[in-house]
Amino acid sequence: MSKIITCEQDSNGHPDKICDQIADAIVTDILQHDKNARVAIECLLKKSQLFIAGEVTTDYRPNYQQIVHDVFNRIGAEKLGWNLTELLRIGILVDKQSPDIALGVDKGGAGDQGIMYGYATNETAEQMPIPYMVATKFLQLLKNHPSKMFRADAKAQVSYDYDTGRITTFLCSVQHSPDVEVSDFRHIIESMMVLAACEYGLDGDFTKLVNPTGRFVLGGSYADCGVTGRKLACDTYGGIGRMGGGALSGKDPTKVDRSAAYMARKIAKDIVQAGYADKCEVQLAYAIGVVQPVGVSVECFGTEHQSLDFIEAYVHDSYDLTPQGIIKRLGLLDVDYNKVSAYGHFGKAGLPWEE
């Protein structure tokens, strides 16, 4: 039986990803004004009603309305298909972080318990799974396409045969204007599918599924409710490699759901870059209020070129895995999280955990 693995990605106009972008825009804005702030933000979007809730501890007062409008403007009101300035209604319920949690975080402990994973593979220059990168590349091409027939909501899914090194099926669902000419629409979409595959040295001989229901006019938050933190596969490795129990977006880096996931990725990538293994998965585990991780493990799936004992000793000797050590090494208080809230947190140039 062939080893066919499937990865997925969503566009920045998908309602869940809109919520992630708003949450991370709030995190970035607050940290730019207060490096000591604690931020945990969740968003829910349905039709033109947005609800922002969470815990924020800071003396700075963010302009939530302006932040939200900036996010929608970046996505594009025309692509969203509705006038957000006239229609958008925002509800806000934000309180301070629990003092019981702050007791542990203030002394440098983890902001919560949890497990986090990082993954890397040498199959692409980005050290990411090839079907994930192809799906992501397709949606980036779609986002930048000048045609007005394309709307903001879209999803892509790529099935890849690791035995033959070929894509077997490329699926996409792309929201479009109601007056679209189906033949023109399909031709452009299929051309972008092939172009995305060619970017990674693959041919265009695969099954192409474009809007299998036949129509995708009603989309975004008018078709589906959006919620922060629901697209973990899209945010991480597309479904290859395990994921931790917590989402990344909407959290300041004292939350190890975010910071430890970035460090685990860096460690896995460093191991692959050093030639110690062809692919690597790192697990980190933390207890709330405890400074050191309670667990560190490395899995190389039999691809290691050094012993696992050597690799584990390398990790132990090379990385400060305390929350504050991670924040300092990766400069996480200065990251613009708007850069990672859509099209993935990993495999992008210019991010400290990718360097």
Model-derived regions: residue spans:
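A short glycine-rich, hydrophobically flanked beta-strand micro-motif that places a catalytic Asp/Glu
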Residues: 37-41, 150-160, 206-210, 276-287
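Short connector loops/turns at beta-strand edges and beta->alpha or beta->beta junctions
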Residues: 2, 46, 121-122, 237-243
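N-terminal, positively charged regions that mediate nucleic acid binding
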Residues: 1-40, 45-46
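Short, charge-patterned binding micro-sites
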Residues: 40-58, 288-292
